[in-house]
Amino acid sequence: PPSLHRRQRQMCIRDRYLLAHPEIAHGPVRIGFTPDEEVGSGTDHFDVERFGAACAYTMDGETLGELQVETFSADSITATFNGFNTHPGFAKGKMVNAIKVAADFIARLPKDGLAPELTEGYEGFVHPYMMNSSVDSTSVKLLVRDFATPKLQEMERLVEQLALEAVDAWPGSSVEVKVEESYRNMKEVLDDHPDVVENACEAFRRAGMEPVIEPIRGGTDGSRLSFMGLPTPNIFAGEHNFHSRYEWISVQDMHKAVEVIIELCQVWEQRA
């Protein structure tokens, strides 16, 4: 994937530089690649103990100078609407179209907020992003996101309530709602490891920029890694327009990110 190749290039440049400059003092450096990050499985088989590091930094950020220490907390919901299919020519009084029930449910979702296209900053959202539909059964997958973990349950209760309302409007239908945890706000862990963030800030300054600390309206593998015992903030990599057809990356920002990594190695060695 392009995102993996991007990170590999950055790591290779950093490694070659450190090997070519043995005078640069640094402690042991561990390198990890999480190739399934974009589908939410990047840390499923990541062995933190074997990795053997006290902390880590993902290179998965956006604009030059950004340092991110908090992410969304995230769950996913699958709402499966069940209907009854029969031959459409003889369906009167028999057919219950699960596609229409699901459409009714989606139409009931808030239209004045709680949607990605209507929120910013620290605002959370509910986002229907995929459907698998037939008359008999239609499943709707939704993302639930907020920076405050307790708010996830509030939004999940709302989704379940709206799903039940849709079913009530279509006699003969039913619904099953399943909630799965995706990741949690890494700030809950990083607040207990201020040196991990402070050392990164110092590396930014040595590389000639003041860190811009802003929340990620999304997640990185650092979220899961932090809760697995490996505190992991996120550093910019020059990425823009994530997941869109217009995604692009700044080569200049990538090189600046490498400078930050090199400085970071030295900061940790000097402050050890």
Q: What is the predicted role of each segment?
A:
Residues 1-13:
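Single conserved hydrophobic/aromatic residue that forms the stacking wall/gate
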Residues 3, 71-73, 134:
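A generic structural micro-feature
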Residues 5, 75-77, 138:
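Hydrophobic core residues within well-ordered beta-strands of beta-rich domains
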Residues 10, 14, 22-98:
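Fold-level recognition of mixed alpha/beta catalytic cores in primary-metabolism enzymes, strongest
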Residues 17:
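N-terminal, charged/glycine-rich beta-strand/loop interface patches
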Residues 20-23, 205:
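Residue-level signal for alpha-helix termini/capping positions
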Residues 98-272:
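Metal-dependent amide/peptide-bond hydrolase catalytic core
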